[in-house]
Every structure is written in C-alpha cells, then in structure tokens.
Amino acid sequence: MKRKQRLTARSRLRAGIRCHNRFYNAMVQDLASAKKNGVYGARLAPLFSELVPAETLKTAMGVSLAFEVNLGQRRPDCVCTVQFGHGSDAKGVCILIELKTCRFSKNMNTASKNLQRKGGMRQLHDSCRLLAKTLPPGSGEILLAPVLVFVAQRGMRVLRVTRLSPQVVYSNAAVLSCTISRLAEYSPPISERSTRRRCVTRRTNSKAFRAKTTTGSIQPITQAKPAATAAVASLFSATAQANTTNAAVGYQPATISLANPLAWVASLFAPK
C-alpha cells in the first residue's frame, strides 16, 4: 500500500512538472504574439490585462520572460519584466508568477487546493522579499506584482488568478531584467517543428529555414540595453491583501482607481 502511494505521488509530481513546462512554452508564444499584435489570448488576459494593457505592451521598450528564477530560498516559476523607457529612471512592471496545477477543475475550494493557495501565497511573499535584495540601483518606478495562478493540467486553462497587493519599488528596469534572466534555471525547449518558419515575399519564392535550439536562458522578446549592475535592498509591507479572480467563471477587469495598477500604467502615457 505504501509503495502504491509513493508511486501515485511520484506520478502526480511528474504530471505537474510536465504541465509547468507546457505552460512555460505556451507563455512564450502567447506573450510574443501579444507583443506583436496588441491583443492578449485567453491564457494571458486574466494574468496581464489589469497590470499591462495589451496596447501598452505592444509599445513597450522591452519585454522579457524568465523561468525557475533562483532567488536562493525561493524560486518563482516565472518572472515577466516590462520596460517603458530607457535609462535608469525608466518605469516598468515586474510580474512574479507562481504556478499551481490541478487535475480536477470543477471544485476550486477543496482542501488540497486551499493548501496549494496558502503555500503559493507564502512563496510569493518570500520571493518579493528576496527579489528586493537583488534590485539594481536606479530611480525608475517598478511595479512589483505577485500573482498566483491555478492551471488545469488538461488544456492548460487558467482556472483562478490570485494577486497580492502590488508594491512600488525603485530600480533600473533594464538591469533588473538582465539580472533576473541570469538567475533563470530553465529555458523552454524549442522543437524542430515549432522553430521552422516560412519566409514569403512578393518578389521571391518562399524559403524554409530552421532556428537553432537555445541552450541558455530564454532570450527577451524585445532586447533591453544593459547597464551597470549592483544590488540594493528595498522594503516591503509585512501584510498584503489578496485579490482573487476565478477565470473559469469569467474574467472581469477591475475598475480604474488610485489603487488599481492599470491606472498607474496609464499615467505613464498621460500628457505632461
């Protein structure tokens, strides 16, 4: 009986890891598409719309993704950084994502899912604290937004999104993106089928080519200029309120207010 229970636990762990890896690869493709077209897909809308509107993402100076970021005691599943300008005073958004996978999605209030949620919130709080120790110096406002995401193992549907209150810190957005990328320990594999592209022009025949498989950290969706690196600590509030969105019922964007990060992002583009 004990051996059977161990095998069941191992199979569940392997299934969760496979789901994590598939979701990572899907995020890379979805975010690249949103950056190009200015429209979020069904997976990214509950995660990003309230923080960075799709049209704002399209005009951002730099967007990067890093997976399994090693912060020492914690390792957030995904960190997305968005840069809105150049220089040490450029504003940006840093989204920390903790991913939880579910075999069954009908009931999101089971005891196991509640334990997953509590554990994920603790992980996010610790990750924010640890990330503060790696912040490079800079005067740019960075919105640090921790997000807990429940995903169905079948279909990779986003079931529920829970947010901690965002924090505003000051750093260099470009250097922060480079620092986080160096700490990443996982890069989604690129298959031959997905890397094959077909170039079509009006005057020449189409030609197929293959991109080389990357072995290091995943490359930013748009390149950001590096600068000098250092570390500076920042303070976070001890308590943070959670905002939960059930994506299975339907995603409803929050109204714009002073506490809404969407209003903060919109203010970046307001006329001076």
UniProtKB/Swiss-Prot annotation:
Induction: Expressed late in the infection cycle. InterPro entries: Herpes_UL24. One of its GO terms (cellular component) is host cell Golgi apparatus. Coiled coil: none annotated. The keyword Transit peptide does not apply. Keywords: Host cytoplasm, Host Golgi apparatus, Host nucleus, Late protein, Virion. Belongs to the herpesviridae UL24 family. May participate in nuclear egress of viral particles. Plays a role in the dispersal of several host nucleolar proteins including NCL/nucleolin and NPM1. Since deletion of host NCL/nucleolin negatively impact on nuclear egress, UL24 supposedly acts on this process through its effect on host nucleoli. This is Protein UL24 homolog. It comes from Equine herpesvirus 4 (strain 1942).
